[in-house]
UniProtKB/Swiss-Prot annotation:
Coiled coil: none annotated. HAMAP family: HisZ. This function is generally fulfilled by the C-terminal part of HisG, which is missing in some bacteria such as this one. Keywords: Amino-acid biosynthesis, Cytoplasm, Histidine biosynthesis. One of its GO terms (molecular function) is histidine-tRNA ligase activity. This is ATP phosphoribosyltransferase regulatory subunit. Heteromultimer composed of HisG and HisZ subunits. It comes from Sinorhizobium medicae (strain WSM419). Belongs to the class-II aminoacyl-tRNA synthetase family. HisZ subfamily. The gene is hisZ. It is found in: Cytoplasm. Its main location: cytoplasm. PANTHER family: HISTIDINE--TRNA LIGASE, MITOCHONDRIAL-RELATED, HISTIDYL-TRNA SYNTHETASE.
């Protein structure tokens, strides 16, 4: 039995979900831990309550609903498009508030019209929040990971650096640190004598020699390749580490990256600003901007008020599975996030779906909504 009570508005919230043409689903509280550890991001991973089955399987208390709902969709072989709604407890170590709390939300799976589906879920979130908080001014912050990825690719960064920057998207301190590293790369020697020695021997440019050298060293020091990474895996990681550290981004490209990340303006003005930025920087990011433009147009077509919406180029959310739109909603003048979500087009494939399933959704923090409703009275 839950240790906390459902908010009094839970029934009305579920009725709102039904009006939005969703199918309510539930998922087990005890979940396999691996999907969350692999795909949920560092911020969520360190907050998960872990346990273990009698057979040694790593399990956890459900820390969120998106991954369980997607797994359920795959397991039941349900066709798409499909819109799921959920409401239930999640368990997460938090700095403020209880570690057991209620979340609700919608996962919109399988609609090939990306812009329309993105606009629909933002509209869904605003609809249910407006009904719970009729006297409050809601503010929406939007970002777009696909535009960010297009910009860093157009700047000519190596694939390894692109992965690091994408992983840091939404964490301004981490992005600043990585950009500082790109402005001042390290020499191979900073990684220690072993790396300096193989660099001096020219092995970093000859993978087979490097693999053989690592294998001989492992054998001589008693390391088992069965109990650790293979010599080839270690060689590839070593070369990537040195290559990343030695990469320098020229001043012009760094200025372009920083100019992009500084964009922060009303959503209605964002398409023109992004096209102007891309033109001045001579970046070929047409596909990403075309989708961005289509989403803004779809929001207008759906009747969404652009006034409360703001685009921040550096805005992301601390979950690794997002691929495009990301957004959060809060009451004007307060920091508490009431709703957050985005697009996660790769997630279902990574979880085992046999075909590509585009997906977008959002979650609501019911305890925070209840607190906001209490302030309103």
């Amino acid at each position: 039995m839950p240790l906390i009570d459902l908010p009094g508005f839970a029934g009305d919230l579920l009725a709102d979900f039904e009006r939005r043409n969703t199918l309510r689903v539930d998922t087990p509280v005890i979940q396999p831990a691996e999907p969350f550890l692999d795909m949920a991001g560092e911020d969520l991973r360190r907050r998960i309550f872990m346990t273990e089955s009698e057979t040694g399987e790593s399990l956890c208390l459900r820390p969120e609903f998106t991954i369980p709902v997607c797994l359920r969709h795959i397991e039941t072989a349900t066709g798409t498009p499909q819109r799921y709604a959920y409401l239930g407890e999640v368990f997460r170590q938090r700095r403020d508030g209880s570690s057991e709390f209620y979340q609700a939300g919608i996962e919109d799976l399988g609609d090939p019209d990306t812009a329309a589906a993105d606009a629909r879920v933002v509209g869904d979130a605003l609809f249910v929040l407006s009904n719970r908080l009729p006297g409050e001014r809601l503010k929406v912050t939007l970002g777009d990971q696909s535009v960010f990825e297009a910009v860093i690719a157009a700047c000519g960064l190596p694939g390894g650096w692109q992965k690091r920057l994408i992983h840091a998207f939404g964490d301004q301190k981490q992005l600043d640190r990585l950009l500082a590293e790109l402005a001042d790369p390290k020499s191979p020697g900073v990684f220690g004598h072993d790396v300096e020695r193989v660099a001096a021997l020219g092995m970093l440019d000859d993978e087979e020699r490097l693999v053989a050298h690592i294998g001989e060293t492992m054998e001589a020091t008693g390391y088992s390749t069965n109990a650790s990474r293979s010599p080839r895996d270690i060689a590839r990681r070593l070369k990537e580490k040195v290559e990343l550290a030695a990469t320098r981004l020229d001043k012009e490209a760094l200025a372009v990256m920083r100019a992009f990340l500084a964009l922060d303006l009303p959503l209605a003005d964002a398409p023109a600003a992004l096209h102007s930025f891309a033109g001045k920087a001579r970046l070929r990011i047409d596909d990403a901007l075309e989708l961005f433009d289509a989403r803004v147009a779809a929001l207008a077509l759906a009747g969404a008020d652009p006034g409360p919406m703001r685009y921040r180029a550096a805005f992301g959310r601390p979950l690794d599975y997002y691929t495009g739109l990301v957004f959060e909603i809060h009451v004007e003048g307060t920091p508490a996030v009431l709703a957050g979500g985005g697009r996660f087009d790769r997630l279902l494939t990574l979880l085992g779906a046999r075909e590509h399933i585009p997906a977008v959704g959002f979650s609501l923090w019911l305890d925070r909504i209840e607190q906001a409703a209490g302030r309103e009275k």
